[in-house]
Amino acid sequence: MALHFTISEYQQRIKAAIASMQSNNLDGLLMFQQESMYYLTGYDTFGFCFFQCLYLGVDGKLALLTRMADLRQAQHTSVIEDIRIWTDQAGAQPATQLRDMLESLGTRGKRLGIETNSYGLTHFNGKAVDAALDGFCRLTESTNLVNLLRLIKSPAELKYVRKAGALGEEALKAGIRKTKAGADEGDILAAQHAAIFSGGGDYAGNEFIIGSGRDALLGRYKSGRRKLSRRDQLTIELAGVYRHYHVAFMRTIIIGKPSALHIRMDEVCRAALSEVESALQPGKTAGEVFDAHARVMDAHGMQKHRFNACGYSLGAKFTPSWMDFPMLYRGNEVELSAGMVFFTHMILMDSDLGAAFCLGRTYIIGDKMPKPVSRYPLTMIVR
């Protein structure tokens, strides 16, 4: 069995989930987020692109409904013993088979939480679940029940976070070494991924971002590579990943002599990151962290060029995105606590002048000040 934590740790997590269910007057929880399944049981798959659901009752019963293709995946990677299979065939109705499973578990008439805000539950399947369970049980929105438990990492999880950080730093260094005038973006990407995989890491929850020239202003991956010019800018965002735990890095690398605008952007980004770092303390809210970022950016006349969020939590995430709950944006009242992990990104994109500058770092929140997972220097990288 390929478990990455002790049975005791999984039991503690399940116990905490049950306690949260009880405090919310729930008799059970229907999970569609792969992250919840992995956190509570170790179940590791990308099969959530199809219908699957993990049930946890307040009595501790666990049962998974999935496809035959994931039967052995669940057997090999999780503590789940009760695995039910819905049948691939014309006219298949997995939501009805979910109801049958719940009937066998004694949940008729019960109040069940359900994770509706999930890549693992499409609108189509969500409507089918609503129809199948209408009159059978009472459903209540519970997407964040396990999310809130996942926010604070255990010592064992933080060990994986630090390993992911070490892999990410090696990937950053490998990419920098490949960066020079005439270099192909594809070679830079290849070096980054090679560093992670050769170090025992995993695929990331989303593609790495890479873009040069005007495409250095893009905050997402896109298809198509180019070669770097003698004077250029290259924006990269990558994550070291270990046991699905992510530690992200973001930098804009300058090729050739930095422009006066790049120098100014660099100064503003570092000043903003310093303020954000000071705000990453227990008792502060996610919204207050964003406010610290915005104050610095706006005071330097960069409001037009900054983003409306400056980071997000990181943890064990699956495709299509490594961004976790919660995000750092204005008014977000989620309170920070020691043991949380946040990626903070200072992003400036000046479309008028075609200039970009980004500086991103991942922190573990401590009892007072946060600790950067990687201490790679924050000074401008010039190649």
Which sequence ranges carry the predicted segments?
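Active-site neighborhoods and metal-handling regions in enzymes and metal-associated proteins
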Residues: 1-383
